[in-house]
Amino acid sequence: MQTHEIRERFTNHFVNAGHQAVPSASLILDDPNLLFVNAGMVPFKPYFLGQQTPPFENGTATSIQKCVRTLDIEEVGITTRHNTFFQMAGNFSFGQYFKEGAITHAWGLLTGSVADGGFGLDPERLWVTVYLDDDEAAEIWEKKIGVPSERIQRLGMADNYWSMGVPGPCGPCSEIYYDRGEKYGKEGGPVADDNRYMEIWNLVFMEKERGQGIGKDNFDILGDLPKKNIDTGMGVERVACILQDVENVYETDLLRPVIDVAETLTGTKYGSDNTSDIRFRVIADHSRTGMMLILDGVTPGNEGRGYILRRLLRRIIRSARLLGATGETMEQFMNTIMDTMTPSYPEIADNRERIMRVAVTEERAFLKTLVSGTHLFEEAATSIKAAGSTKVAGAQAFALHDTYGFPIDLTLEMAAEAGLEVDVEGFDSLMAEQRSRAKADSQAKKHGHTDLSIYREWVDNNPTVFTGFEELDSQSKVLGLLSDGAKISEATEGQEVEVILDQSPLYAESGGQLGDRGQILLGDTVLDVHDVQKIGKKLWVHKALVANGGLAVGDEVVASVDKQWRHAARQAHTATHLIHAALRQVLGPTALQAGSMNKPGYLRFDFNYTEQLTPAQVEQIQAITNEAVDTDWAVNTVETSLEEAKAMGAMALFGENYGSTVRVVEIGGPFSMELCGGTHVAHSSQIGPVALLGESSIGSGVRRIEAYSGLNSFNYLSKERALAEGLASSLKAPSEELPERVAQLVDKLKAAEKEIEALHRQQLMAQTADLLNNAQEIGGVTTLLLRVKDNTNAGDLRTIATTLKDKLGDREGVLVIASDNAGKVPFVVAATKAAVARGAHSGNLVKLVGSYIDGRGGGKADLAQGSGANIAGLESAFGAVRAEIEAL
């Protein structure tokens, strides 16, 4: 039975039983604690917790959820039962049926006849486990279903009490196992041999909520869930393994085709030895996982999800090389896995080109690194072993990372294969030093000095109270003054200083928003604040110029925000949130923020996306953003716990460290809800118009949108309008006809350029007609050494040379054509086929000429070109060429 049929039978079984079929959610969810969806119930978590009402007609649902687990990537392929990507088929009940219903449904599908839509498994080969004290489940299995008591085994919390490993729903579970027969191990049920007895379905009786803890059995139970729920998960790949009667999941119809392709590409046979087999399985598993991650919008990167994808793709590449592949392999692997997965995921067809481009681009980049880095590692490993050591030094691992881009996990893998260990502590120490230097450089740029210990006293004892959300003017006390990185007791007129206040309404740069501008006032004393930076997330440092008067530590002052600056900064920051929301509407949920910068009237927003946006997409994003502005939504902020914010649906950035209390900025309810500590307008209409300036690539898988907001946007649009009106006037056409008129002009220009080029080539041919009259016969070789008119470009020289060479036909001939082109000396050398046979080589002659005119170049035996800088040496170069031809 093919995998897609297994999926269909599962879904049909539960739909016929009144469950609503729910499509698989994306592997990427807005959860800062979750890299990828790793269980079938994850998309249903809010319903299990009672935070949202299940939208399913009968309170029941079924889905086949794509999942990724990457905690033990290194183990993939070593065992044959685990995959990084898997499909979890599940049925869910939210307060409807409980243990008996879940058990009955599962047993009916597994043992039901194939003719009736079941899987037709032999009931005598099925075993079950239950939680230690779950007498109710054990009784249902024995009394209601008829499973003999000797095939019902009880296990502890680590095996039969399910949770996600983090706070959330949990409960006892009952697992169904299939006995694969005595050739796979000893008898005695799952407790005796879990290789012979393969787990295929887990029925979780979701009735409790777990708290913090470690491991599978060391956590607190916080209490009961609002309702008794059912969450089950059947491993599609494992059931396929049984129904297709193959040894393991890698032999099924989904993964075996990739192994077959790998055999062809590498010349190695699967099954020949264990080490090779592990590499084959790595290729098959990672090809599927990598493809599905790219499908859901993940791009290779150096952290978070992007790093996991990069690591998977690089393990594919390296495994293929170790098996014997010599060229690129990613295209073949990706094509194969897309073919096998498309019947279950038809959306692959629409994304095929993008998936291929991302994977192949990563392969080509890594292959350049792999060869040189592997050579360096092998040299290091040889010297380490020769010295009688078994450890790769931290400095060596760091050099591989810093110079060749080798991630530490790849070095660890290579070291293990070579029987070596790695000084990970030493590596981490060097990485920390590098980060510290980078941080110091960044701080030096912001503060003019790298020693931040000078702020320690205030950070520890007098953190700044920020009042800028409530007021723009604040009574403050001067706690400290600094100049050129040193503490001072007073500041005088004309001095550039850093001012520490006990409280301040001025926003310190963070979250992409620039620090406020403003003033610090005391009587006639005026300090113009031109930047505010944050130290240790607690201390505000006001960089200011004493414009008038003087200031001393202990003075009571008024700190005042430049109100125009703040208003325009608020406009830009709120516009950033709207653009982010619009991006996700147009491009999908994986278009997540990768960075931003907001300042008055201007913003730039970086986001994860692999492809250039079309003009239509940019226009749509701008339209959605301005519609949100026009709707005049209230911009609400609330401080709450991180868990509550996530329950509200607030978007958090993966990898960010959030405190126990976070600030949620909500605009238009579900339209935009993000964790943010910045300043914002009160209503979206206060932003004014938002004008997108365009989008561009700033790195692999990261793109940038830039925009104006408020008055800057109005001014920009006014200039654009004036430009359009000017063009319309010049072209004597209405504005709406400008695109067509400009296109017509461009077409005419291209046609004129082609005509000019044709005339130019005609003139060139006419000029070359008699040039061979200047040729000399040197030892039977027709030789033309010629300086043509000045400012003849390299392309024309090449045309002249090839034309003359063709005219020589079967004769032995060598041509050197050069010109003085604004101080540069382009030149071309050509040799006929007969001359090449005699020993002439254009590439060698180019190097010879270049040595006389301070130039260089290269090419093939029959045609080569170069460029020099010393026209005065050309005659000597010609003489050298004559001598070279005489020697042929």
Swiss-Prot record:
Record text on cofactor binding: Binds 1 zinc ion per subunit.
Reaction(s) the record says it catalyses: tRNA(Ala) + L-alanine + ATP = L-alanyl-tRNA(Ala) + AMP + diphosphate
Recorded superkingdom: Bacteria
UniProt keyword list: Aminoacyl-tRNA synthetase, ATP-binding, Cytoplasm, Ligase, Metal-binding, Nucleotide-binding, Protein biosynthesis, RNA-binding, tRNA-binding, Zinc
Subcellular location: Cytoplasm
Required cofactor(s): Zn(2+)
EC numbers: 6.1.1.7
Residue pairs linked by disulfide bridges in the UniProt entry: none
InterPro entries: aa-tRNA-synth_II/BPL/LPL, Ala-tRNA-lgiase_IIc, Ala-tRNA-ligase_IIc_anticod-bd, Ala-tRNA-synth_IIc_core, Ala-tRNA-synth_IIc_N, Ala-tRNA_ligase, Ala_tRNA_ligase_euk/bac, DHHA1_dom
Annotated GO MF terms: alanine-tRNA ligase activity; aminoacyl-tRNA deacylase activity; ATP binding; tRNA binding; zinc ion binding
Binding site residues for Zn(2+): H573, H577, C676, H680
GO biological process, one term: alanyl-tRNA aminoacylation
One GO CC term, this protein: cytosol
Matches recorded under HAMAP family: Ala_tRNA_synth_B
UniProt xrefs under NCBIfam families: alaS
Family statement: Belongs to the class-II aminoacyl-tRNA synthetase family.
Biological function: Catalyzes the attachment of alanine to tRNA(Ala) in a two-step reaction: alanine is first activated by ATP to form Ala-AMP and then transferred to the acceptor end of tRNA(Ala). Also edits incorrectly charged Ser-tRNA(Ala) and Gly-tRNA(Ala) via its editing domain.
UniProt note: domains: Consists of three domains; the N-terminal catalytic domain, the editing domain and the C-terminal C-Ala domain. The editing domain removes incorrectly charged amino acids, while the C-Ala domain, along with tRNA(Ala), serves as a bridge to cooperatively bring together the editing and aminoacylation centers thus stimulating deacylation of misacylated tRNAs.
The protein's name: Alanine--tRNA ligase
Organism name: Corynebacterium glutamicum (strain ATCC 13032 / DSM 20300 / JCM 1318 / BCRC 11384 / CCUG 27702 / LMG 3730 / NBRC 12168 / NCIMB 10025 / NRRL B-2784 / 534)
Lineage start: Bacteria, Bacillati, Actinomycetota, Actinomycetes, Mycobacteriales
Gene encoding the protein: alaS
